[in-house]
Each structure stands twice: as C-alpha cells, then as structure tokens.
Amino acid sequence: MISLGFSPCPNDTFLFYALVHGLIPDVPPVNVLLADVESLNERARRRGLDVTKISYGAVPWLLEDYVLLRSGSAVGRGCGPLVVAREPGRLDDVRGPIAIPGERTTAYLLLRLRAPQLGPFRPMPFDQIPRDVAAGEVAAGLIIHETRFTYAKQGLHALADLGEWWETWTGLPIPLGGILARRDADIALWQRAIRQSVEWAFANPAATRGYVKQHSQELEDDVIDAHIKLYVTDFTRDIGDEGEAAVRALLDRAAQARLVPHCGKDVFAPP
C-alpha cells in the first residue's frame, strides 16, 4: 500500500478528497497520514512516505530520494506568511524570540531571507503561535495556514507580509509547498492522479466540505472558503513555467545565502 501524507488544512483535504475516497481511477490503495507540514517534512527526511506534501524550504535535503510533482502545489499571490506581534511596529525592530512553525518550513526560509539578523527562533506547532504571541511568551510569531485569517481576532498586528515582500523582490508568485514522490514510484501515475483529484475538487466543492471540516482547525465556512481560494490555484493544477521559476528562485536565492544546500536541475518531474 502506498503511504500518502498531507496536512489537515483545508487546501490539502480539499485537493486530495477525490483521491483518498477512491474517486480517481487506476490509483492503488493509499495509507493516509494527516500531519502538520513540519511533521511531514521530518517524515520525508526519514524517507518515511511514498508521496507527501512538503514545504519547498525542505526540498533541498530530499532530492536524492524524491522528486517534486507538477500538480498539488500551494503557489500563488497574496498568500504569504505573516509576522505578527501584540503591538504594531516594524519587523526589523523585533527584539526577542520569534515563534516559527518549523525550521524546514518555507515561511521560516522566507523570514531568514528577509531579515537574517533576527532571532532567536522558537519552533512550535503552527496553531500554537498566535496564543503564545498574545500571551507575551514570544516577541513575535510567524503565522501560516488558517492562523493567517484569524490572528486579528486575537488582538494581534501584522508587522510584515513575507509574501508581499517576495513578490516585490522577485516579481514571482510565492512558492509555499508542493508534492514529493519517491523517485522509484510511478511518477506519471501520481502526477495524473493528483491533477485529476484537484480537477474533481474544483468541479465538486460542496462534496468535499464535510471532509474538510472534519480536519480543519477553523470550522467557519467563510474562513475555509478563503483558505481554499488563497492556496488552491491554477498553479495547483499544474505548476507551469512561472510556478517552477518561483520555486527555483527560492531555492537558488536560499542557496546563495547559504541557508540550504544547492539544488541541481532535476528538481521537478518532467511534464
């Protein structure tokens, strides 16, 4: 049985619904692991999954055994991680520990590129970060996923939008996460299956809602709808030339800054 990992966030449960419910033809049975993306990054590091959602920030350490698929990505515009604090201010003025959702997340890599002088950093589950910021346990927090839509309800203020910064710096969309498959897997099958699952979800969004709500941190329909709209885009159907350029720009610039190992050309599976 194929092991498949993805997060319980609405964008992932939405796009994988058809695949995991047997609605895509000629797909072998899957054993699903639902876990936050940093846990999936770690599982992939231990070669523990056949196909998995991954942070693009984790990819440089994994390419010996895995290749990125062209469908299933979270790439877009206006969807970047935010740095939040209890009081309004400037990112460069933050003094003290910053909560992060993991050291292999793309969000953390973007923060290191944007403000290399900041730190120390305190890794924790992404949904714990707003609470710790509000309680004064950390000076600021790097937020992703559903917390991007709910931080203001906790009285927090955005100091920086790292996606906006990235788009201004590069002119490219924000590459957050993608799908890895083991190089010895049937790559063509999984690219087809995931693309068909994405297309099925776009065509039948109401059918996915119960499964999405079952696993979401936030149950309000407007939050779920905003989450899916922001992170499931045309790039999710197929990464395309622009999306691939965004991923390569992230990995190349991070390697130049000595934050990640250098990646060769064989990052994405062929179309």
Positions of PLM-derived features:
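Bilobed "Venus flytrap"/periplasmic-binding protein-like clamshell domains
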Residues: 2-21, 34, 80-139, 144-149, ...
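A structural signal for short loop-to-beta-strand junctions that line the ligand-binding cleft
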Residues: 2-3, 65-73, 96-97
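Beta->alpha turn/N-cap motifs
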Residues: 36-38, 47-60, 125-126, 142-149
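Hydrophobic residues within well-ordered alpha-helices
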Residues: 44-45, 133-134, 254
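Hydrophobic/proline-rich hinge and linker segments of small-molecule sensing/allosteric domains
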Residues: 68-90, 167-183
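Pocket-lining segment of extracytoplasmic ligand-binding domains
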Residues: 125-214
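Conserved C-terminal helix/tail region of periplasmic/extracytoplasmic solute-binding proteins
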Residues: 253-271
